[in-house]
């Protein structure tokens, strides 16, 4: 039995996401970007004080139990200066981040990691950085015209260590920060229709040939048990398929009610959009009270989720938003 400690409150600051949206009305547990930057000290709403959207998802998650607080950075986004700018504008203090967890080895989730480490450690301490060996393969994609587009390499374990990371490079699941966060191990692929990303490639080095890598087996998710609500699953891209992710989480925590899922569902792009109807149908049995789509979910999937589950359940993410669960 995994002893994931229940938390009294979980605050999730969206440091990076694909979209910016402060105008749409939000439910009570979501504070929009405009409110957050003014609260952080901005004297006016301007280009300099607002957040910028990018192709990624980065979450700063603060779990509180009594007088104890634990802060986790889940992914960092593609570009360091923008990550640091957004955190500054939101008033997100990085110096008390207790650990970093990375979802998978793509440039747009790890590219900002070295600068994030600088912001966290200030050159004065080390911070655990949880990864797994599969994240450090070279990655690429086959374009519709047949060309191969290599992805920018992610920082190596040595590069991370040189910037203050205590690199924890293992494949297994683990509890983080006194048991307040769960980082999964490998996610079993069990659904009949979630077959991964067909255009995805990998290779061990630049001297090796590209090989098909649709399943992206290095992907991991984070889960938090919020007292009086239940388990919230954070899946940055859901390359494993969000139904597989939720099935795995239910099996790992069969004694904890499932409350919600937050993250990219990777249902955008011609091949992945075909999975939207099956995904919707297979999400229904989980009885989710909150679905918080982000990043790579795509507008067609978002429309389908809203049409099926309604606005009381579906709350889209946006950069600069703050979600509070208690």
Q: How would you label these PLM feature ranges?
A:
Residues 99, 106-110, 128, 208-319:
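Cap/insert and terminal regions of metallo-dependent hydrolase folds
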Residues 74, 177-186, 232-235:
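Short hydrophobic-aromatic micro-motifs
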Residues 98-168, 185-196, 281-289:
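Active-site HxH/HxHxD metal-binding segment of metal-dependent hydrolases
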Residues 87, 313-326:
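Binuclear metal-dependent phosphoesterase catalytic core
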Residues 48-55, 63-99, 114-115, 122, ...:
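Pre-active-site segment of Zn-dependent metallo-hydrolases
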Residues 61, 75, 87, 104, ...:
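Divalent metal-coordination and catalytic microenvironments
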Residues 13, 130, 166-171, 182, ...:
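General small-molecule cofactor/ligand-binding pocket signal
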Residues 1-69, 183-222, 226:
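Zn-dependent metallo-beta-lactamase
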